[in-house]
Amino acid sequence: EGSGGSGSSGNFTTGSNVHMSSVTNTSNAGTGGTGTNTGTNTGTGTGTGTGTGTGTGTGTGTGTGTGTGTGTGTGTGKGAGAGTGTATNETAGPGTTTTTTTRSTTTAATAASPPVTLTESLLNK
């Protein structure tokens, strides 16, 4: 008989005490067993890739804005008063500056003269 586990046919075994010269042993085809293979296959893979892309885009936009101004310019204008410029020009103008000095002299009131008494000695002179 063939080996049951191998599933092959035409194989046979002979005993050590059987003389092959006079005996022919014929084996029947053996029936093989069935089996299932189980296994877990794992694998890792790495890969690199490159790509290029182009794109176009268009867009339109509208906007409105409002604003209010502050009166900070007023303070600056006060610093540049015309009166200051006039005084500077009068002082720095060569040949155009005229200095006039006017003195007011007040004469104090004269006290009344005391009466003069003439003596005879003065009159006789």
Curated annotation (Swiss-Prot):
Transmembrane segments: none annotated. Signal peptide: none annotated. GO terms for cellular component: nucleus; perinuclear region of cytoplasm. It is found in: Nucleus; Cytoplasm, Perinuclear region. Sequence repeats lie at residues 30-31, 33-34, 35-36, 37-38, 39-40, 41-42, 43-44, 45-46, 47-48, 49-50, 51-52, 53-54, 55-56, 57-58, 59-60, 61-62, 63-64, 65-66, 67-68, 69-70, 71-72, 73-74, 75-76, 77-78, 79-80, 81-82, 83-84, 85-86. Residues 30-86 are annotated as: 28 X 2 AA approximate tandem repeats of G-[TA]. Residues 1-125 are annotated as: Disordered. Residues 116-125 have a biased composition (Polar residues). Keywords: Biological rhythms, Cytoplasm, Nucleus, Phosphoprotein, Repeat. Residues 85-112 have a biased composition (Low complexity). Residues 30-84 have a biased composition (Gly residues). Phosphorylated with a circadian rhythmicity, probably by the double-time protein (dbt). Phosphorylation could be implicated in the stability of per monomer and in the formation of heterodimer per-tim. Its main location: nucleus. The keyword Cytoplasm applies. GO terms for biological process: rhythmic process. The run of Gly-Thr is implicated in the maintenance of circadian period at different temperatures. Deletion of the repeat leads to a shortening of the courtship song cycle period, and thus could be important for determining features of species-specific mating behavior. Forms a heterodimer with timeless (TIM); the complex then translocates into the nucleus. Essential for biological clock functions. Determines the period length of circadian and ultradian rhythms; an increase in PER dosage leads to shortened circadian rhythms and a decrease leads to lengthened circadian rhythms. Essential for the circadian rhythmicity of locomotor activity, eclosion behavior, and for the rhythmic component of the male courtship song that originates in the thoracic nervous system. The biological cycle depends on the rhythmic formation and nuclear localization of the TIM-PER complex. Light induces the degradation of TIM, which promotes elimination of PER. This is Period circadian protein. It comes from Drosophila ananassae (Fruit fly). The lineage of its organism: Eukaryota, Metazoa, Ecdysozoa, Arthropoda, Hexapoda. The gene is per.
